């Protein structure tokens, strides 16, 4: 990604990529927890987007690529994934790049469903 990572006092690093891809990294004792904002989402939006979210969540789980989670207080859909192997910097960079690419793809797909 070519970006320096700076963590705050809460062990979090916030990244804004391409002006609309927001990702946070939370460094815990033995994992990095990645959170990527996908779309703002009202709990009363149509059924088709919730069905699509469940389909995508199943695919993510089957491929061990993370999960989608709805944050009620913020009315936001997040993409969440944990990096569990912190021993290899190249693996970490690869996982971060894969996460951001998947986040962008999910955002593009689900934005279309949110418009319907």
UniProtKB/Swiss-Prot annotation:
Swiss-Prot/TrEMBL keywords: Chaperone, Cytoplasm, Virulence
InterPro entries: SicP
Primary localization class, coarse: cytoplasm
Gene Ontology cellular component list: cytoplasm
NCBIfam families, sorted: PRK15329.1
Similarity remark: Belongs to the SicP family.
Function (record text): Molecular chaperone required for SptP stabilization and secretion.
Protein name: Chaperone protein SicP
UniProt organism field: Salmonella paratyphi A (strain ATCC 9150 / SARB42)
Lineage: Bacteria, Pseudomonadati, Pseudomonadota, Gammaproteobacteria, Enterobacterales
């Amino acid at each position: 990604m070519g970006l320096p990572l700076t963590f705050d006092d809460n062990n979090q690093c916030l990244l804004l990529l391409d002006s609309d891809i927001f990702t946070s990294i939370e460094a815990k004792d033995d994992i990095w927890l990645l959170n990527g904002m996908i779309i703002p989402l009202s709990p009363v939006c149509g059924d088709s987007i919730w069905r699509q979210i469940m389909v995508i969540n199943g695919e993510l789980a089957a491929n061990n690529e993370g999960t989608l989670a709805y944050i009620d207080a913020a009315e936001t859909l997040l993409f969440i994934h944990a990096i569990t192997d912190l021993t290899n910097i190249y693996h970490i960079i690869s996982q971060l790049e894969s996460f951001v690419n998947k986040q962008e793809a999910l955002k593009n797909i689900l934005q279309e469903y949110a418009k319907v």
